[in-house]
Regions:
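Bacterial N-terminal signal peptides that target proteins for export
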Residues: 3-16
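Hydrophobic helical h-region of N-terminal Sec-dependent signal peptides
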Residues: 17-22
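C-terminal motif of bacterial Sec signal peptides marking the signal peptidase cleavage site
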Residues: 25-28
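Bacterial signal peptide processing site
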Residues: 30-32
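Post-signal peptide N-terminal segment of mature Sec-exported envelope proteins
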Residues: 37-97, 101-103
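Extracellular polysaccharide-degrading/modifying enzymes targeting complex plant/algal/animal polysaccharides
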Residues: 93-355, 558, 574, 627, ...
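Glycine- and acidic/polar-rich repeat regions and solenoidal domains
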Residues: 171, 309, 330-353, 370-381, ...
Length: 765
């Protein structure tokens, strides 16, 4: 059965002055004829929440710290809550709780490295503290209360130093160049988008507690999906916490019970067209809102949503160091530009950086609902390193129209806790741990995406429709480098879609649904990846769209909705010139022989050609420039009879072709007359063997269970045939894997499988 590619119109809107990153939460816009939407292909997903410790609620502090009351005028007020519809209408709620095992709240870090001891300049510096006053002089001894006062005081190149504590600031605007906001030496600093509700405000009503106040009127119809009801409760950005633990939002007061909450707004924001938020909004009033909770808030610290945006940066050279961000509630899209309080800053990301050469390091982003946590837009040469993105309601991070951005050493886990739709959402599928669009030379290196605590096994065939991409490069990623990353129990580890060029190398994927997926992308090099116990290790397909056009007139070549970035960069959106070398595909998570014949089709390498709408055929013979030196390790021939298919066009020009040729042995491919001789190698140097996981002849140790996450050592064992037998690396691949050139050099025979990885020995603590 052939993959059906559904295309909807798309339009890109980017405006830094208006605070627009794109219409979707973090990156990538695909639209219908009336309104921008989200990215139209590929990802399918839901997320799971683990019940663990959240950021500590703090009831004390300064003016902009944790002392904000439920009636705080500066917070705005009102939250829109109406009846929800669609699947999962009561399944979502506040962003998830921070997984204590994944995020040490005292010293957030992705490794053992001590963070938070940053040098403090002697001049052009201002201090803030939770017990500070804006009437002070901003010295360490007499700190300010608010970040904005400190920022207004320093000049270009200045530094704001935050003392330890929990702050609840109004949205912070950075307009000066080369500004740094950092934690004080050794200090743990949180900025939170929630407010503490005074215990006296809670009134018992039967089995629930109610608090009425000037809470913010959040838009609950501001989704990427034009019909918000299809997103169910995920469309509702409000959050509530008891002692830092997130409560789950429900659609009515009658549904409130222990661990849940409901928000009542009598004048909510509504749609001019109930099924199309692109037609505009009837903006709700800023009046009394009532939160109903099912957990006793009177002997605890109760927090509810207050702010959507934490920080907006419009100047270059910004640095954020050791500042943890939690409990912000941006709506998912940028469509609402006249929020009663936030105006054009109600969406769609908590920390929005539109300044080049910026850095975000050593920070935790958690419990950000609906919209994304960190977004770069028109932010060239920027870097995010050693951060944690955990338990966020939607996608965690993203970049749009931002060249030379580097993500390195970050940790991602348990995002999309709001459970946005990720299957059958077509143009509105946007959820990923990180999504990048319209960029040149993005680097995603040495990051960890770990869903080992999730209560599902992504490697099961059935999870194909319930899991989403970890790293998604979509719609005009040019020459991205995705290297040395570790993925466990994820949906699709690496999704490279309608883009061009790039290197996907030395990544390790274990216990997942799909390892590497390449579609509608030319000249990408897939080298030296290790994929273990994964349902579909490598998937390469042709996208029916072409030449940067998302939608054409029926029976016509006329492009109705061109994607401007891709057309300007002359991207073909055809899967051609792909190179696949030196990968180890081991111990596929198999359901038996039926995987090769039943939908969804799966085998170590699955190829899916297609005919473009202009009639051009892109099948296996057109897809590849080279394909060789890969390693296939299967349980046995009867359980896993097919190693790869070679997809060919149908002999009937009126029909899309079936999967014509299946190979039981990798070395048979080059001998088959159907395989195009223009493709170099065609596995003449492949290693294709059988055996148990316990006796894997390649790895030092491969865990035996699909769900035995972080228990394998993917270093090659002594005497392994994969040692030193791989194809020599091109210079760009070698440099992407090891920029220093100390461990990996071009032009020399290399090991097969991952060469350098952040968790080569995943069992090592």
């Amino acid at each position: 059965m052939k993959r059906i590619h559904i295309t909807l119109p798309r339009q890109v809107t980017v405006s830094v002055t208006a605070g627009l990153l794109c219409i979707s939460a973090l990156a990538g816009c695909r639209t219908s004829a009336d309104e921008p939407g989200a990215s139209a292909s590929g990802s399918t997903a839901t997320s799971e929440t683990t019940s663990t410790q959240a950021p500590q609620a703090d009831g004390a502090g300064g003016k902009n710290a944790t002392s904000a009351s439920a009636d705080s005028k500066s917070a705005g007020g009102g939250s829109s809550q109406g009846a929800a519809g669609g699947d999962g209408a009561t399944s979502a709620g506040s962003a998830g709780n921070v997984n204590q095992a994944n995020a040490d709240l005292q010293a957030p870090s992705t490794g053992n490295k001590r963070i938070g001891n940053y040098d403090v300049p002697k001049t052009n510096v201002a201090w803030v503290a939770t017990d500070g006053k804006d009437s002070n002089d901003g010295t360490e001894a007499k700190p300010f209360a608010t970040f904005q006062k400190a920022l207004n005081t320093v000049k270009d190149g200045g530094t704001v130093v935050a003392k330890a504590g929990t702050y609840r600031p109004d949205p912070i605007d950075v307009t000066k160049k080369n500004i740094t906001i950092q934690s004080a030496p050794g200090a743990t600093v949180w900025i939170k988008g929630s407010e503490v509700v005074d215990k006296a405000k809670w009134k018992k009503q039967g089995s629930v507690w109610a608090a009425t106040g000037n809470f913010h009127n959040f838009c609950t119809v501001c989704t990427v999906n034009q019909d918000p009801k299809q997103e169910g409760m995920a469309a509702y950005p409000e959050q509530a916490f008891i002692n830092g633990k997130a409560l789950r939002q429900v659609a009515s007061k009658a549904e409130v019970k222990e661990g849940t909450f409901y928000v009542e707004d009598k004048t909510p924001t509504t749609l001019k067209d109930p099924k199309n938020n692109g037609k505009g909004f009837n903006v709700g009033k800023q009046d009394a809102i009532t939160y109903y909770v099912g957990s006793d808030p009177t002997n605890a610290t109760a927090e509810v949503s207050r702010n959507a945006r934490a920080i907006t940066v419009s100047a270059e050279g910004f640095n954020l160091k050791g500042i943890n961000v939690a409990q912000y509630s941006p709506v998912q899209s940028w469509k609402l530009q006249n929020d009663p309080v936030f105006k054009d800053k109600a969406g769609a990301v908590a920390v929005f950086i539109a300044g080049s050469k910026s850095t975000v390091v050593d920070s935790t982003f958690t419990q950000v609902s609906s919209g994304g946590a960190l977004g770069f837009s028109d932010s060239h040469g920027s870097r995010a390193a050693n951060n944690r993105f955990v338990d966020n309601g939607g996608g965690a991070a993203g970049a749009n129209r931002s060249d030379d951005v580097v993500y390195e050493g970050n940790y991602f886990s348990n995002n999309n806790t709001a459970k946005f739709r990720i299957h059958d959402c077509f143009a509105y599928c946007t959820i990923a741990d990180i999504k990048v669009t319209h960029t040149n030379r993005t680097v995603f290196r040495g990051n960890v995406v770990d869903y080992s605590a999730a209560p599902r096994e992504a490697s099961k065939a059935s999870e194909r429709t319930t899991t989403f991409p970890a790293f998604w490069c979509d719609e005009g990623c040019i020459d991205a480098k995705t290297v040395n990353n570790f993925f466990t129990n994820v949906g699709t580890a690496i999704f490279y879609e309608v883009s061009s060029g790039g290197v996907i190398a030395s990544n390790v994927v274990e216990g997942s649904n799909t390892g590497v997926s390449v579609g509608g992308t030319d000249k990408v090099k897939v080298y030296n990846n290790t994929v273990s116990r994964t349902y579909r290790p490598i998937y390469v397909y042709e996208d029916a769209r072409y030449d940067g056009c998302n939608s054409r007139e029926k029976n016509s070549e006329k492009c109705v909705f061109p994607e401007e970035w891709s057309t300007n960069h002359h991207l073909s959106w055809n899967t051609t010139g792909v190179e696949i070398y030196n990968n180890i595909l081991s111990s596929r998570a198999s359901n038996g022989p039926k995987d090769a014949t039943n939908v969804p089709l799966a085998m170590p390498v699955y190829l899916d050609g297609a005919k473009n709408t202009n009639g051009k055929e892109i099948y296996s013979n057109q897809m590849f420039a080279g394909f060789d030196y890969n390693v296939y390790y299967r349980s046995n021939q009867s359980n896993e009879p097919i190693v790869m298919n070679w997809d060919l066009p149908s002999k009937d020009p009126q029909k899309d072709g079936p999967m014509d040729v299946k190979f039981s042995k990798a070395t048979d491919i080059s001998k088959d007359s159907n395989a195009g001789k223009a493709v170099k190698g065609i596995e003449t140097h492949a290693l294709d063997t059988f055996g148990s996981r316990a006796h894997n002849p390649y790895f030092a140790k491969e865990a035996e269970s699909n769900s035995a996450y972080n228990q394998s050592n993917y270093n090659l064992k002594e005497g392994s045939k994969a040692r030193g037998s791989g194809k020599p690396l091109p210079e760009d691949v070698a440099k992407a894997i090891d920029p220093t050139g100390k461990k990996v050099a071009p032009g020399k025979a290399v090991d097969r499988g991952a060469l350098v990885n952040v968790k080569m020995d995943s069992a090592k603590k």
